Amino acid sequence: MNMQESKSIIEVNGVSKFFGEKTALDHVTLNVKKGEFVTILGPSGCGKTTLLRLIAGFQTASEGEIKISGKEITQTPPHKRPVNTVFQKYALFPHLNVYDNIAFGLKLKKMPKQTIEKKVKAALKMVGMTDYEYRDVDSLSGGQQQRVAIARAIVNEPEVLLLDEPLAALDLKMRKDMQMELKEMHKSLGITFVYVTHDQEEALTLSDTIVVMSEGRIQQIGTPIDIYNEPINSFVADFIGESNILNGVMIHDKLVRFCNTEFECVDEGFGENMPVDVVIRPEDLYIFPVSEAAQLTGVVQSSVFKGVHYEMTVLCNGYEFLVQDYHHFEVGALVGLLVKPFDIHIMKKERVCNTFEGKLIDETHVEFLGCNFECAPVTGIEAGSEVKVEVGFDNVILQDNEEDGALTGEVKFILYKGDHYHLTVLSDWDENVFVDTNDVWDDGDRVGITIPPDGIRVIKN
């Protein structure tokens, strides 16, 4: 890659976006190289579309700055930025035919008629719609309308093309066809693509670089292979493809314990007996009739044919493993599992308990999360002191009836850890509460939150 290609065309530096008291983006920093195909990936509400709209100029950053080609454009209106945007809903003009839709921006610039005709025909050729220039847009299929929207965007020869979930409205086959066309188009045009999606497969297929977002923050930036093979945390591991994610303990370098069993691994630099997250992809587990080679033995709980492989759930020592393999084992079969050291991925835990800022009210009461909680008797700390409050994940109780809780919240993220669920609950105090539970909840569930006195640990600041 030469110096020109490696130069950043988009620089997002410490950008935040607030909507009232809600933080949509939290100090985001991102550099996009010229000519890259970058995909911003994340679940609904993670901030990916907000970031795209800030780059496009449809919204203004609350903090930080944005540069394109070295020029600061944070406050620059959209029509003065060297970018064009393709939307999910296409935004074509129904009263104009295909040619006039594509030519619209060029006519606004008062370009000569011959120049417009040349550019429009080149754009139509690029998207494979040479014979459609005089068709009404309402007569086109969804895929054809999307091609027209892309042609209208590229005809202006922008430095950056922004695409906001442009394939979401298409059926599966058309979406896959358009993915390949977009990839070829990017290669031919040589301009920078910034693509927003919640579809992990789409991101892995299209991108040079993937930016994974959650809760207004960037979690990881890397190539599709790096993101898939070396996720930085349990959120990324769970969001990108299927994963077995379990609690483990790093005994020492290259030796980890999980599922009540010790395994050799290749990871180093963790502290002895440090709690860690262990990630194993389903395709990296070997399954076979029980033999001495088995590291774990278990019983097949379910088996589903997926076309290119079987997907099986195996219960070992009370932990469920998802396994993908070409060999089929019947439900109820006793099997062995084996995983090679380099297929065990070790990640430092982001946290080992809930930690909150609080205030000691008296010997047996502490205030945090906007509530007054009863706690075990506290000694050596004066009433009224600012304190740190620790609550174990398994010490938080969730209830169906919100009124039964000391406070309320909404389930935002669910991670299965083999023998329990690890939930992220956004409290109405706008702080996350992390919960380990065997109960089954759904994203978006409203819950009451209770913490028993013996589950609260008060620590002097």
UniProtKB/Swiss-Prot annotation:
The record places domain ABC transporter at 10-240
Q: What Gene Ontology terms describe what this protein does at the molecular function level?
A: ABC-type putrescine transporter activity; ATP binding; ATP hydrolysis activity
Q: What membrane topology was assigned to this protein in its record?
A: Peripheral membrane protein
> What's a Pfam family in this record?
ABC_tran
Catalysed reaction per UniProt?
A: ATP + H2O + polyamine-[polyamine-binding protein]Side 1 = ADP + phosphate + polyamineSide 2 + [polyamine-binding protein]Side 1
State where ATP binds. Answer: 42-49
| Primary localization | membrane
Record's SMART domains?
AAA
Q: Where in the cell is it found?
A: Cell inner membrane
Q: What class of enzyme is it?
A: translocase
Protein task: Part of the ABC transporter complex PotABCD involved in spermidine/putrescine import. Responsible for energy coupling to the transport system.
- Which family is this protein grouped under? Belongs to the ABC transporter superfamily. Spermidine/putrescine importer (TC 3.A.1.11.1) family.
Subunit relationships: The complex is composed of two ATP-binding proteins (PotA), two transmembrane proteins (PotB and PotC) and a solute-binding protein (PotD).
Name of the protein: Spermidine/putrescine import ATP-binding protein PotA
